[in-house]
């Protein structure tokens, strides 16, 4: 740059100005009162199993975040007089004795806000789905006080799950805490995921919290929600079994804080905690490692308080606070169905009801395997839709009476027509509440089904056809509603119109007739039982049809054996299968054996000692048939001379029968 003619003058002015600035700065420093600022630095005394014992930080707060040299973080779990037990939130690599520790002055917080929707994060808000880091502009502490009584409102709105047995018998309200409890592998997570998937058409934000689960199981849950539900309105907080115990411990608290962000803004949220049994085991592990005194089943004394202060955060807020709600579906696992264990009894007493899943019902292919006698909702009809409450009035009583009658009739038959009708009705109810996964029903579908059941429209229907009825009902109702709605008519609340609901329920009879006609047409067309059931009834009808086909194949096999073997062996085979087939099948087998021997079937002597079936029971025992066979004439296959033998006790026929009976007994 070429200097200007006034450059010497400008340089002299800058020198004077710089000297003045330096003098002013020195004067300012002379007037500053310097005070020493000290930062407490603690030291690690020992570390083991994810717990570090730190000294030198006497002013540390409970749940305060501490930062170790090297970047590892943890939170203060217990505060003793000399040592602080710090639960590490990261792998403890690099943390050893004499490692420096510093306070941060902040408690554990988690990011919250709309940016979490559709994301998979850990309890600290760190992404696990490979996406971009979250904006931490808004955070909430993981430990927050539950709403006060004056801040709450009554639970009066239903949280629709789409599962008929839950919505009809054990209604869950917005702001309620309903425990899902049962043995391992009884469908607890499946029931909770069905509730999440059904919110795809509602305004509920869902938060799924996985604690100590296998990574593969968590991945299946996420894939199911992404395929059938609305993942853009869900948040997945994952603390798998491989992560640090500290992350597993704070996971449910972080999930509730994320859901509270939406509740406090007048929205509705649902939290599924899977599961609190593993969380209790993690709390026990941390308590034993930090030398807390153990109590019942080695759990510390504050385990009830830990879960109570967590679940009390679920509530329906008053209208003055926006009217938002936070519902909770905690999951707990029992051991051999023991509901009287420590953790199950604690959770049952904390929550507003429980849905008990039974392993025997699950093994009997009843899904969901809800035990009607042990399950309860303490909110129930207060949050149920009026139309659904009216339609399901006697459902639970009728089903409970059916279960009692079914257990009683296993020891004998029924002669009362009224009891037989009650058994038939109970079988229809059981088929109706057996619902496949991801086949949610609308409230209108549930009301119409229950009204049709109460009107007797399903009494003449085979239980195998209930599954196709449930599958085809939504489309059928949509078509009927379109036909009943005038052109350019305003939107109509069909659930509030009793006459319209009755008309829709009556139309179900026509749908049942069509389904039965389709089934009959497929049967007459010779379609295999598996294919017909698959087209009509889905998986459940298919299994029933496969069972019928297997029984038909057994009867056919018995007849083929009777045709191919010798007369003596035919009599022995017929005697052996007489306990398993009906009296008619025995007569067919005898006729076939006579035809093989060259004798007309019409001349065969009737089998007077065939086993008689009890009324709704099995045939008489084999021993009764054997004793009767010694005092009756038996059809022989050796010609007319043998058929006209004067005495069944002697001759060749008696010898053959005695030899066959001896071989059978041996």
From Swiss-Prot:
It is found in: Cell inner membrane. Residues 591-601 have a biased composition (Low complexity). Keywords: ATP synthesis, ATP-binding, Cell inner membrane, Cell membrane, CF(1), Hydrogen ion transport, Ion transport, Membrane, Nucleotide-binding, Translocase, Transport. It is a peripheral membrane protein. Residues 545-590, 623-641 have a biased composition (Basic and acidic residues). Its EC number is 7.1.2.2. It is an enzyme of class 7 (translocase). The keyword Membrane applies. It catalyses: ATP + H2O + 4 H(+)(in) = ADP + phosphate + 5 H(+)(out). The record marks 375 as: Required for activity. The keyword Cytoplasm does not apply. GO terms for molecular function: ADP binding; ATP binding; proton-transporting ATP synthase activity, rotational mechanism. Residues 527-666 are annotated as: Disordered. Its main location: membrane. ATP binds at residues 182-189. GO terms for cellular component: plasma membrane; proton-transporting ATP synthase complex. It holds the Pfam family ATP-synt_ab_C. Produces ATP from ADP in the presence of a proton gradient across the membrane. The alpha chain is a regulatory subunit. F-type ATPases have 2 components, CF(1) - the catalytic core - and CF(0) - the membrane proton channel. CF(1) has five subunits: alpha(3), beta(3), gamma(1), delta(1), epsilon(1). CF(0) has three main subunits: a(1), b(2) and c(9-12). The alpha and beta chains form an alternating ring which encloses part of the gamma chain. CF(1) is attached to CF(0) by a central stalk formed by the gamma and epsilon chains, while a peripheral stalk is formed by the delta and b chains. HAMAP family: ATP_synth_alpha_bact. NCBIfam families: atpA (TIGR00962), PRK13343.1 (NF009884). Belongs to the ATPase alpha/beta chains family. This is ATP synthase subunit alpha 2.
């Amino acid at each position: 740059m070429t200097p200007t003619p006034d450059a010497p003058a400008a340089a002299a002015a800058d020198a004077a100005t710089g000297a003045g600035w330096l003098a002013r700065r020195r004067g300012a420093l002379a007037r500053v009162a310097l005070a020493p600022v000290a930062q407490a630095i603690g030291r690690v005394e020992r570390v083991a199993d994810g717990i570090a014992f730190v000294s030198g930080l006497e002013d540390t707060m409970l749940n305060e975040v501490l930062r170790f040299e090297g970047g590892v973080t943890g939170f203060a779990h217990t505060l003793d007089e000399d040592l602080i037990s710090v639960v590490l939130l990261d792998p403890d690599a690099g943390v050893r004795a004499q490692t420096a520790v510093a306070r941060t002055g902040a408690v554990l917080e988690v990011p919250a806000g709309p940016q979490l929707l559709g994301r998979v994060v850990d309890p600290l808000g760190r992404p696990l789905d490979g996406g971009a880091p979250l904006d931490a502009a808004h955070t909430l502490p993981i430990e927050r006080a539950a709403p006060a009584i004056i801040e709450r409102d009554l639970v009066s709105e239903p949280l629709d799950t789409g599962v008929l047995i839950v919505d009809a018998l054990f209604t869950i309200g917005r702001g309620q805490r309903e425990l899902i409890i049962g043995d391992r592998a009884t469908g607890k997570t499946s029931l909770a995921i069905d509730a999440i998937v059904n919110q795809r058409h509602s305004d509920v934000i869902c938060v799924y919290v996985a604690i100590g689960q296998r990574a593969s199981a968590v991945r299946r849950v996420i894939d199911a929600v992404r395929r059938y539900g609305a993942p853009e309105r869900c948040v997945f907080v994952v603390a798998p079994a491989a992560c640090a115990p500290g992350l597993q411990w704070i996971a449910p608290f972080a999930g509730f804080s994320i859901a509270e962000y939406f509740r406090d803004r007048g929205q509705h949220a649902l939290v599924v905690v899977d599961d609190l049994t593993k969380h209790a085991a993690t709390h026990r592990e941390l308590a034993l490692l930090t030398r807390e005194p153990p109590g019942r089943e080695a759990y510390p004394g504050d385990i009830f308080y830990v879960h109570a202060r967590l679940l009390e955060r679920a509530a329906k807020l008053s209208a003055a606070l926006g009217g938002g709600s936070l519902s909770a579906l905690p999951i707990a696992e029992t051991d051999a169905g023991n509901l009287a264990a420590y953790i199950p009894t604690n959770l049952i007493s904390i929550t507003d009801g429980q849905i008990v899943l039974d392993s025997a019902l699950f093994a009997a292919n009843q899904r969901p395997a809800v035990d009607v006698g042990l399950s309860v909702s303490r909110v129930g009809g207060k949050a149920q839709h009026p139309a659904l409450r009216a339609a399901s009035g006697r459902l639970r009583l009728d089903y409970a009476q059916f279960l009692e009658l079914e257990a009683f009739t296993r020891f004998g038959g029924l002669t009362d027509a009224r009891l037989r009708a009650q058994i038939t009705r109970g079988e229809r109810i059981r088929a109706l509440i057996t619902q496949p996964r991801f086949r949610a029903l609308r409230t209108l579908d549930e009301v119409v089904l229950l009204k049709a059941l109460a009107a007797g429209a399903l009494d003449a229907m085979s239980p195998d056809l209930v599954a196709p009825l449930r599958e085809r009902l939504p489309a059928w109702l949509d078509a009927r509603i379109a036909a009943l709605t005038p052109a350019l008519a305003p939107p109509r609340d069909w659930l509030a119109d009793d006459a319209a609901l009755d008309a829709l329920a009556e139309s179900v009879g026509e749908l049942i007739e069509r389904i039965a006609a389709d089934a009959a047409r497929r049967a007459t067309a010779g379609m295999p039982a598996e294919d017909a059931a698959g087209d009509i009834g889905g998986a459940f009808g298919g299994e029933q049809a496969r069972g019928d086909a297997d029984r038909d194949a057994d009867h056919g096999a018995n007849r083929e054996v009777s045709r191919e073997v010798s007369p003596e062996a035919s009599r022995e085979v017929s005697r052996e299968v007489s306990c398993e087939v009906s009296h008619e099948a025995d007569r067919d087998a005898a006729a076939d054996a006579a035809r093989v021997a060259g004798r007309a079937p019409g001349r065969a002597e009737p089998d007077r000692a065939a086993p008689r079936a009890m009324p709704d029971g099995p045939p008489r025992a084999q021993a009764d048939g054997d004793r009767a066979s010694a005092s009756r004439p038996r059809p022989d296959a050796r010609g007319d001379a043998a058929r006209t033998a004067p005495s069944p006790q002697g001759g060749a026929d008696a010898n053959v029968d005695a030899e066959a009976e001896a071989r059978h007994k041996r």
